[in-house]
């Protein structure tokens, strides 16, 4: 049953995980990346033993169907998370090590965006939630949902091994470039960038730079 406080609606269109619409009468999530980015993501997914997704959809379906990786996908839109989980079952590609985890950030609107600023006290749980899962240490992270800068900070602060981060929409959204006060992208693939994160301790100045990232909902 959908949470009555969630404001998500599904208009008549095809459900696309990263495309212009998240509504459909027929639920069929696809990877809505441009061709170069799509190929790059698929290649990285096939090589990874464990994947963390911030934002779920076509990439989750691809991971479940085409890889043997452990997958944790964080989703702020409860109705979308439930529909995606049901889709994996219907397609016969659900497995115990593929999890779509709804994160309660309060009421949401389109694309799982926060619906009420008064719920800000929950927002930090979205980037931090997967790092409390016992035994989960992702090799690859796709940042393609909400709170993207905070998600990058969470990887930096919690990763236990070298971790590749794919950050979508980075090149066309200048707000995200604030992270370059702390680290630089290792590669650019169309609108996406790749970061290579190593486990390390950070100094106070770096923490001070990262703190505002947790207040950005983009």
Residue positions per predicted region:
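P-loop/Walker A phosphate-binding loop and immediately adjacent motor/lid segment at beta-alpha junctions
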Residues: 11-13, 65-70, 91-99, 161-166, ...
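Short, charged, surface-exposed secondary-structure boundary motifs
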Residues: 80-88, 109-112, 174-180, 195-199
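Class I SAM-dependent methyltransferase Rossmann-like catalytic core
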Residues: 10-48
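Surface-exposed interaction regions that form or flank ligand-binding interfaces
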Residues: 104-132
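Juxtamembrane luminal stem/stalk of type II transmembrane Golgi/ER carbohydrate-processing enzymes
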Residues: 2-9
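Short, flexible loop segments at the rims of nucleotide/cofactor-binding pockets, characterized by
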Residues: 27-32, 48-51, 116-123, 141-144
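SAM cofactor-binding core of SAM-dependent methyltransferases
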Residues: 34-110
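C-terminal substrate-binding/active-site "lid" region of AdoMet-derived donor-dependent transferases
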Residues: 130-135, 139-218
